[in-house]
């Protein structure tokens, strides 16, 4: 089982991830983290996500380094992600990032860190955006260099 921490666990994507992890036979939710002060802190992450209780309470900080964790999935804020990547680097944890609005210097830092720890980063994981990108890719293969494809 791959042990996953979801950062931004009470948000829309975080809740969807927790639901998906619950349905997976190869993934296990090990930690659900969100912003300090949210009313969901201390609540069961399964219940917050609209599924049955899973016993993983939403916390406002990553578990201690001694806790067994295989990967971090971050759908937080740009500021939080900038801090989270440093924690993942320190702990040598792979991270998947779906946070939007990262500053250029943070993206540069991600590129450097990716030589040390595995990083998957996309600004947008929505189905609509990814379907559009796939359609543009297909159109460019069909039309080749004869047309200029632009998304407005």
What are these regions (language model features)?
Residues 10, 14-18:
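N-terminal Rossmann NAD(P)H-binding glycine-rich loop of SDR-like oxidoreductase domains
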Residues 54-68:
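Short acidic low-complexity segments
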Residues 79, 85-91, 98-121, 130-138:
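Rossmann-fold NAD(P)-binding glycine/threonine-rich loop
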Residues 72-73:
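N-terminal Rossmann-like NAD(P) cofactor-binding module of classical short-chain dehydrogenase/reductase
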Residues 1-4:
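Extreme N-terminal starter segment of soluble prokaryotic enzymes
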Residues 8, 127, 131-152:
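Conserved anion/nucleotide-ligand pocket segment
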Residues 9, 76:
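NAD(P)H cofactor-binding loop motif with strongest signal on the N-terminal glycine-rich segment
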Residues 23-51:
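NAD(P)-binding Rossmann-fold cofactor-contacting core
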């Amino acid at each position: 089982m791959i042990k996953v921490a979801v950062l931004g666990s009470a948000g829309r994507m975080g809740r969807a991830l927790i639901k998906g992890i619950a349905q997976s036979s190869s993934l296990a939710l090990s930690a659900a983290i969100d912003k300090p002060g949210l009313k969901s802190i201390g609540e069961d992450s399964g219940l917050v996500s609209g599924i049955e209780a899973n016993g993983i309470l939403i916390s406002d900080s990553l578990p201690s380094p001694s806790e067994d964790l295989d990967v971090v999935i971050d759908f937080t804020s740009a500021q939080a992600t900038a801090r989270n990547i440093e924690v993942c680097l320190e702990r040598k944890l792979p991270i998947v990032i779906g946070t939007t609005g990262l500053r250029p210097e943070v993206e540069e830092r991600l590129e450097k860190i990716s030589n040390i720890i595995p990083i998957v980063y996309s600004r947008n994981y929505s189905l609509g955006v990814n379907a559009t990108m796939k359609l543009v890719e297909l159109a460019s293969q069909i039309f080749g260099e004869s047309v200029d494809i632009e998304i407005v």
